[in-house]
């Protein structure tokens, strides 16, 4: 699974707990978008999570 190139957000692992308290493994995956960004004056493609896109931690290349 892809990881955010800006904040290094990655997959989290945990347990799904039913009403009868049975536990099974589950994962939480980040919302990753592959977009073009401007870095050091040049454009490149990067894997960026939507949290970083919303908070303007990266400038998009149009």
From Swiss-Prot:
Pfam family, one: Ribosomal_L28
Keyword Ribonucleoprotein on entry: yes
A single GO molecular function term of this UniProt record: structural constituent of ribosome
Transmembrane segments: none
Keyword terms of this UniProt record: Ribonucleoprotein, Ribosomal protein
UniProt xrefs under InterPro entries: Bacterial_rp_bL28, Ribosomal_bL28, Ribosomal_bL28/bL31-like_sf, Ribosomal_bL28_bact-type, Ribosomal_bL28_sf
Superkingdom of the organism of origin: Bacteria
NCBIfam families documented for this protein: L28
Similarity field: Belongs to the bacterial ribosomal protein bL28 family.
PANTHER family xref list: 50S RIBOSOMAL PROTEIN L28, LARGE RIBOSOMAL SUBUNIT PROTEIN BL28A
Protein name, per record: Large ribosomal subunit protein bL28
Underlying gene: rpmB
């Amino acid at each position: 699974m892809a990881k955010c190139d800006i904040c290094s957000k990655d997959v989290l692992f945990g347990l799904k707990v039913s009403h009868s308290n049975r536990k099974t493994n589950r994962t939480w995956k980040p919302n990753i978008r592959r977009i073009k960004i401007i870095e050091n004056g040049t454009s490149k493609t990067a894997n960026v999570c939507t949290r970083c896109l919303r908070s303007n931690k990266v400038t998009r290349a149009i």
